[in-house]
């Protein structure tokens, strides 16, 4: 099994991976400083489908802890796992690399965060839901833990939103993504919002936005460790997460009008390009009400600094 080493958005000639493993499915596992959770995440992949059926590519991006060595040690004992080391710590960039330079041709593509534990048979359930929904481009999993699990489940089942923690994309959809050259802007926070939109648009932002293109899967479940209010480390994580949620909100608000007007080819390469293109709109952005307001102000300050629109 090959361990690939990637620098930001490029792969050297000697780093290119095999076109396809014998497995039918590929799963991208995004890992950024996940040394404590990544083994449990991979073990849960093992229990959620036959390891003869799925190949896991662990996208180790921008890690400053022991994640890389932990994954490499695990992969030495498990041929169905390939570590991919990426210098840039960015999920959107890692998503692009997986789709275009890592995974070959598979029957289905799964995406999971490196801190989630996938419930037994969840990948099978997602695949069956996807195959049983001919009009769907994606199948969305639901959480079975966390204080907000009921609310998040409602988002999936009623609003047909994709949660970035775990989802599946149809083979034909990935093929069309590649043919169109569609990439997520580097720096985009979270893949769930933009992937949900691309799936519902069927890669045509100027066309119809159809909920039925996302198939909710109530039997495809995952869980994750809840943050503790008594842990200083978890409080820091909570702070960063809330700022990132605010960034994600405004990034989506800025991106959608560009795509609706210019189509998929208008997709910016990075959030820096997005901010520059929407510099005039950024000046008019305002914080929301409630607790979000505090974190929105931090996010807006960062966005305006990147756009040079202080």
What name fits each language-model region?
Residues 24-26, 55:
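Cell-envelope/extracellular polymer assembly enzymes that use nucleotide-activated donors
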Residues 229-310:
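Terminal low-complexity segments of carbohydrate-biosynthetic enzymes
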Residues 37-40, 65-74:
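Acidic helix N-cap motif at the loop->helix transition within catalytic regions
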Residues 34-48:
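Short, well-formed alpha-helical segments that are part of the catalytic scaffolds
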Residues 105-117:
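Short beta-strand-to-loop acidic/aromatic patch adjacent to the donor-nucleotide binding site
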Residues 44, 57-69, 88, 116:
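A conserved acidic beta->alpha catalytic loop
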Residues 117-153:
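Conserved donor NDP-sugar-binding/catalytic core segment of glycosyltransferases
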Residues 96-108:
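Active-site nucleotide-sugar/metal-binding loop of Leloir-type enzymes
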């Amino acid at each position: 099994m090959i361990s690939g080493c990637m620098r930001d958005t490029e792969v050297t000639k000697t780093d290119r991976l095999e076109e396809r493993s014998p497995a039918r499915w590929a799963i991208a596992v995004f890992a950024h400083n996940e040394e404590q959770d990544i083994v449990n995440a991979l073990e849960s992949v093992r229990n959620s489908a036959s390891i003869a059926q799925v190949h896991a590519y662990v996208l180790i991006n921008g890690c400053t802890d022991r994640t890389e060595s932990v994954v490499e040690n695990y992969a030495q004992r498990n041929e169905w796992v390939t570590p991919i080391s990426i210098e840039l710590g960015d999920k959107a960039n890692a998503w692009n690399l997986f789709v275009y330079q890592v995974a070959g041709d598979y029957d289905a593509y799964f995406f999971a965060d490196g801190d989630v534990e996938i419930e037994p048979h969840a990948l099978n359930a997602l695949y069956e839901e996807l195959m049983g929904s001919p009009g769907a481009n994606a199948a969305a999993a639901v959480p079975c833990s966390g204080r907000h699990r009921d609310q998040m489940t409602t988002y999936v089942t009623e609003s047909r939103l994709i949660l970035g923690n775990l989802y599946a994309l149809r083979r034909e959809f990935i093929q069309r993504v590649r043919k169109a050259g569609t990439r997520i802007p580097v720096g985009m926070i979270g893949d769930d919002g933009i992937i949900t939109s691309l799936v519902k648009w069927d890669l045509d932002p100027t066309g119809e936005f159809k909920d039925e293109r996302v198939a909710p899967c109530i039997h495809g479940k995952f869980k994750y460790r809840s943050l503790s209010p008594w842990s200083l480390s978890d409080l820091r994580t909570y702070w960063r997460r809330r700022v990132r949620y605010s960034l994600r909100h405004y990034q989506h608000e800025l991106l959608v009008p560009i795509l609706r007007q210019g189509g998929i080819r208008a997709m910016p390469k990075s959030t820096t390009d997005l901010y520059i293109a929407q510099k005039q709109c950024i000046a008019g952005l305002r914080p929301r009400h409630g607790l979000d307001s505090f974190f929105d102000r931090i996010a807006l300050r960062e966005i305006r600094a990147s756009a040079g629109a202080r």
